[in-house]
Amino acid sequence: MFLTDGSSLNSLTMTRRMMVGKRVRTRFAPSPTGYLHVGGLRTALYNYLFAKRMDGDFVVRIEDTDQSRKVADAQENLIKTLEWAGLMPDESPLHGGDFGPYLQSERLDIYKKYCEQLLEAGHAYHCFATSEELEENRQLQLKQGLQPKYNRKWLPEDMGGSMPRSEIQKKLDEGVPSVVRMKVPDYVSVWFEDIIRGPIEFDSATIDDQVLMKSDGFPTYHFASVIDDHLMEFTHIIRGEEWLPSMPKHLLLYEFLGWEPPKYAHLPLLLNPDRSKLSKRQGDVSVEDYIRKGYSGEAIVNFVALLGWNQGEGCEQEVYSLQELTERFSLERVGKAGSIFTIDKLNWLEKQYIKNRPAEDIIRVIKPLLLSELEKKETLLDPATITGERYLEDVIELMRERVGFEREFVTFSSYFFFEPETYEEDAVKKRWTPDTNSLLDEFLPVLESMPDFTAEAIEAALKEFVAPKGLKAAALIHPLRIVSSGVSFGPSLYHMLEVLGREAVVRRIRKGMAVITLPQQ
């Protein structure tokens, strides 16, 4: 409610009563104008975590009142991306619910009803100013060093303006296009308590007479969101700090309509390492960008959760499941300062998840990728074997510490599935000597006759082979790695050879001996 102190500059203060007994309800309300921004994912996540921790409802509402910016299929993609991240809405345009419709374009009659109510109560008025007139007025105010605001040319006489009601009615009767503006009270202060930022106050002198209904019959964001937030019974509005300047308009609308506003929490901005606002010009900002690159939902959710939320003094944990985040999240631990978006931290988190993810979960991701590759390229290995769970589990356990994304179990480790087509040139120059071919040729029968082709047996046989020759194990280890994988790096050689199997290893040694030649001195 508003409280006035009776002075010449009234202090109209918005106060809130405790919402005793109300079920906590939060919402994520994106516009269907494209893909989901990582900042939007964080907003959705914090709304989800807060609602779930309080045994409440997390709702997705689509704010599509700006039809000119609407992108086909955007709303479905937004919701599917949230579900991919594990943020399943309790209510949405796709899931339904008791407070629908959840598309604002399907709620136009509702907005019209409340617009008429504001007009009748003297809190709103019709404005017939053209875009040219508005721009001319804006430029004039800028030249005068003033903050651009509507000049209230069409404010009726009985509301403190100079326009006769008869002139307004004449325009309406003639069907002249108009917008509906809210009448902001003069000389008032609008105050509210932000959960994150504490008390914030606005002077009405800085508030424009906001357009509520556009000439096309669609509401503006400000009007529709207030109406819907009330009718859908949201208890907490958690959104980005870019919406802070809109707060006085929203609170005034609540007052005009006689409604109790929800509680608000405005999240800090996401920043680039140079502390500029995160934007498309400086890198990937859509969640879909990161999905395409191979990041998992768990890592991205974990990452954005830490962008602004402080786990608490003395807490060094950085890897959280969605359930753990739900149990620990608190709006009171969200900071005010902007949060730095560092890709290195996301990469680190992705690796932590890969290290600990069950092999069967990884197989579900990489098997379709492998099958797709097998359709494009021929393999000399048995397709049934290399696509089997046992083989893939062995590859995963060997490569967990070495890959950054799940798909790299196939791309980075392709030698487990396909013959090397080339050999790392620098490695050959460094590790291939005039004696290498003869050593490999002599070692081949040892490999072929081993009773057990295991990592331990291969290691023992290799060391036993080089010892009488006065050679170090490296004389064979490096050439064997090159011919088997084509590269100079990888997991334990002996375990790699065991997984590949005797037949593949022998074949690759023979091929390498035939193909690799010493570089010209």
Curated annotation (Swiss-Prot):
A motif ('KMSKS' region) lies at residues 277-281. GO terms for molecular function: ATP binding; glutamate-tRNA ligase activity; tRNA binding; zinc ion binding. GO terms for biological process: glutamyl-tRNA aminoacylation. A motif ('HIGH' region) lies at residues 30-40. It catalyses: tRNA(Glu) + L-glutamate + ATP = L-glutamyl-tRNA(Glu) + AMP + diphosphate. PROSITE patterns: AA_TRNA_LIGASE_I. It comes from the Bacteria. Its main location: cytoplasm. InterPro entries: aa-tRNA-synth_I_cd-bd, aa-tRNA-synth_I_codon-bd_sub2, aa-tRNA-synth_I_CS, aa_tRNA-synth_I_cd-bd_sf, Glu-tRNA-ligase_bac/mito, Glu/Gln-tRNA-synth, Glu/Gln-tRNA-synth_Ib_cat-dom, GluQ/Sye. The keyword Ligase applies. It is found in: Cytoplasm. NCBIfam families: gltX_bact. HAMAP family: Glu_tRNA_synth_type1 (MF_00022). Catalyzes the attachment of glutamate to tRNA(Glu) in a two-step reaction: glutamate is first activated by ATP to form Glu-AMP and then transferred to the acceptor end of tRNA(Glu). Belongs to the class-I aminoacyl-tRNA synthetase family. Glutamate--tRNA ligase type 1 subfamily. PANTHER family: GLUTAMATE--TRNA LIGASE, GLUTAMATE--TRNA LIGASE, MITOCHONDRIAL-RELATED. This is Glutamate--tRNA ligase. It comes from Chlorobium phaeovibrioides (strain DSM 265 / 1930) (Prosthecochloris vibrioformis (strain DSM 265)). The gene is gltX.
